[in-house]
Amino acid sequence: MTNLINESFTLPCGQILKNRVCKAAMTERIAKGDNLANQGHINLYDMWADGDIGILLTGNVQVDRRNLEGPANVVIDKNNYKNQLGTLKEWSAAGTKNNTQLWMQISHAGRQTPGEINSSPMAPSNIRLNIPGKNYGTPVPMTEEDILDVIEKFVFTAKIARETGFTGVQFHSAHGYLLSEFLSPDINNRNDAWGGDIESRACLLYTSDAADDW
């Protein structure tokens, strides 16, 4: 019997995966206080790329340092990207050896930003996240300007990923972070173009994806 897991697979975009094994995105939290990629990321993905995996997904790389999943996340924004271009290229080189695909997971934590990082995180509405033992602040509903700025941030980070050798990106739209908050009718109670039916709630995700010319 043919083992499909070990067979190559061509994605609709034309990218060829050497097999059908994927390392899921798992937050690394090994950046320092500057939130820059470092040697730890290079070493980790160098090791994983030796594991005969078709796709390696990174942990969430944040687009906005004010809204992080954790204090040791990598952030790529217009203020710091030049300081880590070399490291990002080394990271991608390590993660793409042995014909491995390396996709950067791009994220914005939204209301799920820990309170010690930001007590007033951005979100589609002001519905606070209540989890026993966790400290999350009351979010500030995003303005139209905020939403357009976030779209620009997602696109910028994707652009840097491409330019530094990552072979794809994943927009993190699950696990309670910003994009999934907009998708959820329980969190997104907006009555403008970014809320309401599922098409409108998905507009942030669709617009970010459409603006990214990968």
Model-based region annotation:
Residues 17-21, 53-64, 122-128, 168-182:
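Short coil-to-beta-strand
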Residues 87, 153, 204-207:
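Charged catalytic carboxylate motif
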Residues 51, 164, 212:
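Structured loop/turn residues at beta-strand edges in well-structured enzyme cores
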Residues 206-214:
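Single conserved hydrophobic/aromatic residue that forms the stacking wall/gate
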Residues 1-107, 150:
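N-terminal capping/small domains of soluble enzymes
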Residues 77, 93-97, 101, 107-166:
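Non-globular sequence segments
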Residues 58-81, 106-116, 171-195:
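Glycine-rich, proline-tolerant flexible connector loops at the mouths of alpha/beta enzymes
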Residues 36, 40, 76-83, 142-149, ...:
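Alpha-helix N-cap and loop-to-helix initiation/capping positions
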